[in-house]
Structure formats: structure tokens, C-alpha cells
């Protein structure tokens, strides 16, 4: 997994290139002021049963000789749900605050965005270039009237990886919903890099041309794009992300914040892709001689919650250190709480001063000199906790 977290350079160059283009503009461009989008409530009980058969027919994972699978929508639900657990129970407070910094510190919005990104990262697997890799499961897609040729017939499929299809689909969806296209591009790159690698600008240009004009494009068969859009809109409702928000703009995405989202997204995908945590399901059966999604039993909302909870428990991720805040002027209560002192105990002057200075100044290093009996042991532990926060 660590290898997937280190390839940020091309992504950073892409963002910096966009900034340079903006700076080199020969004349100032007056743009209509756009407000930040409002977040709708998340419909967390939304399962896949309400999606069209076409949106449900695409495969994301397969195994056991293609006798088992996960559909795209099932894998995306798994990734979205485990992202919620990651945000709530694994990411540090600093990590969450960094993600929320572009949302005026609102961690609920940061959480919704993270869950949405995890829930659409593999929407690009709704493409013939990916679908052709399983002969058996391509039958399920063909049953919906879509053309999937043999893998060898897609000579240029390597130029359009599914991560970039996810990226292009997301930025198109935000723009189509009335959002600012440039900001949409910044955020959509996060799903494009979910394998930890991002191609150079020329490779992205070639991929975008294929996305627009080759097999599975709007020019070829718009139903592929319609299925992706349906999945994106469904996940936006499920996670509470403002995908359709006319006249708005997502916030600027600083590199540090982008790295915070992208690194967490890699972990969410890694967990959701582990078959020990999120087992494959039986593949669709044949009906009238054809393998079809028709009649396939999707998991209910309750079953999906149980699946996500079971997967998270199996992963057994450690909980981060959670250090309580120190209320101003309450050094005594802090020490009593941290060390189990009775109410009659009072911290020494050195102990009170150390916590107050650490809270106020946030130094990188503290050196405390005090006479014996000043409580330097508890002082050191208390000050260290404040600095770690």
C-alpha cells in the first residue's frame, strides 16, 4: 500500500501548471462570483436496488474463475462505507482538520466529500475498455444491449485507465450540475490518482480524447456515460455531496489538503478491495441462456451496514491517540482527569504554567527546569499531550 502513496509529483505538477496558466493570462478575466455549494442531507439508507439494471450490471472485482464477483456499485458502497469508518475512527484529528480546512473547518462536510470520493473512485470501470477483461461477466453487460468486444479488439485500451475515466466523468458531472469546471477538475484528480500514480499531461490529453471519441464515448454509445452519471448522482445522494449545484464552485484545493484526501482515499480503496474484509458475491445466473443482472438480489441497507461493520472489524485498524482539549484556565481539572487525582489535589505552579505555555505558544520543544517536588513527571506527560494535539 505504501507504494501507492508516494507518486504525488505528477499530480503536484498538474496543479502548479494550472496555477501558472492562471498567472500568465495576458489580461485579467472577470468571472462571475460563485458561492460555495450547500450540502444536502445524506440518504444513508439508499441501497442499489433503486438503480437501473444497466447501472448495476458492470463488474468491478472477480475471482474463483469468474464464478464470484462484486459489481461496480457494490464495491463503491463498500469503499464509501469504509471511508466513513476511516474518517470517524482512524484518521487523526490533524488529518480531519486539514481536510475540513477548505470547508471553513466543517468536518461534517469534509466527511461527506471523502465518502463521496471513495464512493465514485471506480465509476470509470463502467467502460468497455475495462469490462472486456472478463469474458463471462461481459455477458451480463451485453444482456443490457451494450457492446463489449474481446480484449484483443481494444488495441488502445491501455491509454484509457479506469481511474482517468472516473476523473473525467466526475469533472463532467460537477460542471453539468452547474459547478465551476476548473475547480471540478482539481477535485476530480483525486479519484484519478486513487492507485497512487498519475500520468503526465500528454498521457492525460490522449486519454481524454479516447474518452470523448473512442468506444464507450458519447460519440460511440451514450449509454455508458449515462450509466456512470446515474451512479455518480446516486452516490451523491447517498453521501450528501452537492453534485448538482448551479452557480457554485468547490473550494480551491491546496496541495496539502489534496494529499490528505488522496492518501485516505487510497486506504479506503485498499480496504474495500480486500476479499477477506469484503467478500465477493455469487455472480449473476443465466436466464434464457444468457447471464443477466435481471433478478439479481442486491443487498438491503441493513445488510450493507452489517457488511461494512463486519469488514471494518476484520481489518482491526488501530485507533489513533485521542487527546482531550484543555479548557482555558482549567489546568487543575486537566491534571485530575489525566492522572486520576482526587478533587482535593491541586497541580503545582510549574505544572499549571507548563500546560498554559504549551497551549498558548504551541512550541516545537519545551525545556522545563524546576526544583524537586514540582511534579516534573506529570508535567512532562501533560505538556507532551498538549504539544501532540
Where are these regions (language model features)?
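Accessory nucleic-acid engagement/destabilization modules that flank
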Residues: 6-327
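Conserved pre-motif I regulatory segment
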Residues: 332-367
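Short acidic-aromatic active-site loops that bind/stabilize oxyanions
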Residues: 68-76, 155-156, 340-351, 373
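Walker A/P-loop
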Residues: 362-383
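Conserved coupling segment at the C-terminus of the helicase ATP-binding
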Residues: 320, 324-328, 333-335, 367-371
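Conserved SF1/SF2 helicase motif Ia
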Residues: 386-389
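Well-ordered alpha-helical segments embedded in enzymatic catalytic cores
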Residues: 78, 82, 349-354, 379-383
Amino acid at each position: 500500500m505504501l507504494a501507492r502513496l508516494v507518486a504525488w509529483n505528477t499530480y503536484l505538477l498538474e496543479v502548479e501548471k494550472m496555477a501558472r496558466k492562471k498567472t500568465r493570462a495576458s489580461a485579467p478575466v472577470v468571472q462571475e462570483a460563485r458561492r460555495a455549494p450547500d450540502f444536502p442531507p445524506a440518504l444513508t439508507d439508499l441501497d442499489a436496488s433503486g438503480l437501473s439494471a444497466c447501472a448495476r450490471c458492470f463488474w468491478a472485482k472477480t475471482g474463483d474463475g469468474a464464478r464470484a464477483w462484486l459489481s461496480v456499485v457494490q464495491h463503491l458502497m463498500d469503499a464509501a462505507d469504509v471511508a466513513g469508518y476511516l474518517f470517524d475512527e482512524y484518521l487523526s484529528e490533524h488529518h480531519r482538520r486539514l481536510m475540513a480546512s477548505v470547508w471553513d473547518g466543517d468536518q461534517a462536510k469534509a466527511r461527506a466529500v471523502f465518502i463521496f470520493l471513495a464512493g465514485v473512485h471506480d465509476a470509470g470501470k463502467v467502460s468497455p475498455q475495462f469490462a472486456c477483461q472478463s469474458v463471462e461477466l461481459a455477458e451480463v453487460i451485453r444482456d443490457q444491449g451494450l457492446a463489449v468486444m474481446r480484449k484483443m479488439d481494444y488495441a488502445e485500451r491501455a491509454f484509457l485507465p479506469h481511474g482517468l475515466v472516473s476523473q473525467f466523468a466526475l469533472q463532467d458531472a460537477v460542471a453539468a450540475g452547474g459547478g465551476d469546471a476548473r475547480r471540478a477538475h482539481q477535485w476530480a484528480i483525486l479519484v484519478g490518482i486513487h492507485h497512487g500514480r498519475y500520468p503526465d499531461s500528454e498521457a492525460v490529453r490522449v486519454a481524454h480524447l479516447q474518452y470523448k471519441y473512442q468506444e464507450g464515448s458519447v460519440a460511440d454509445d451514450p449509454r455508458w456515460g449515462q450509466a456512470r452519471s446515474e451512479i455518480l448522482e446516486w452516490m451523491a445522494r447517498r453521501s450528501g455531496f452537492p453534485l448538482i449545484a448551479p452557480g457554485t464552485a468547490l473550494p480551491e484545493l491546496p496541495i496539502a489538503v489534496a494529499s490528505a484526501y488522496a492518501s485516505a482515499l487510497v486506504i479506503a480503496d485498499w480496504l474495500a478491495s480486500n476479499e477477506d474484509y469484503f467478500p465477493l458475491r455469487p455472480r449473476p445466473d443465466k436466464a434464457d441462456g444468457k447471464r443477466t443482472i435481471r433478478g439479481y438480489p442486491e443487498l438491503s441497507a441493513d445488510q450493507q451496514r452489517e457488511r461494512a461493520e463486519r469488514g471494518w472489524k476484520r481489518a482491526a485498524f488501530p485507533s489513533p491517540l485521542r487527546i482531550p482539549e484543555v479548557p482555558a484556565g482549567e489546568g487543575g481539572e486537566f491534571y485530575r482527569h489525566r492522572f486520576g487525582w482526587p478533587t482535593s489535589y491541586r497541580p503545582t505552579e510549574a505544572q499549571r504554567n507548563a500546560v498554559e505555555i504549551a497551549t498558548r505558544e504551541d512550541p516545537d520543544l519545551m525545556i522545563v527546569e524546576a526544583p524537586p517536588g514540582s511534579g516534573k513527571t506529570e508535567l512532562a506527560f501533560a505538556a507532551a499531550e498538549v504539544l501532540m494535539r
